[in-house]
Amino acid sequence: MKKISYLLLMLLSYLSCAEPPTQFDEAALNDTFITLEGSKVTLQSILEKHKGKTIVIDIWASWCGDCIRGMPKVKALQKEYTDVVYLFFSLDKGIEAWKRGIKRYNVEGEHYYLPKAKKSAFGDFVNISWIPRYMVINKASEIVVFNVIEADDNKLIKALKN
């Protein structure tokens, strides 16, 4: 019994240290987002549009207090790292709330609405447990920051400097 408990503990330790993914899976890449104009686009087409550039993905919602409090930090990043593409993926409860939130909080960047939010293929892939959530995709199209919840997190800043 002791050996089984020990092996189980070792397995759990190993799994908790697993490396985050460096590429989106096929289901996430094929997930559908909605543009401000109302068009449907896939994550793959969004990323291909910015191939060769560093991308910050901000997963947020207008109802999220932490997201709104974090906006000044995002705006500071945008001011300092002007060559970076900023994508905002909204988990708002509806398109109108999403659009109002963008205007109300003067969020600058490219905006996309995720209709199925956490229940989408993208939501499953990134395992959204908290927002805001920030990710960084490098110029080689690799996910180099998978999960930070503060826009001034050292991991995020380091990735933008590279």
Which residue stretches match the model-derived regions?
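Thiol/disulfide oxidoreductase modules built on the thioredoxin-like
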Residues: 107, 114-160
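Conserved redox-active cysteine motifs that mediate thiol-disulfide chemistry
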Residues: 59-76
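Conserved segment of the thioredoxin-like fold in thiol-based oxidoreductases
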Residues: 79-121, 128-131
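N-terminal "domain-start" segment that seeds a small globular fold
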Residues: 17-49, 109-110
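Conserved hydrophobic packing residues within short motifs/helices of P-loop NTPase cores
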Residues: 57, 87-89, 135
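Short active-site neighborhood of thiol/selenol oxidoreductases, capturing the structured segment around
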Residues: 46-64
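Bacterial Sec-dependent N-terminal signal peptides
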Residues: 1-25
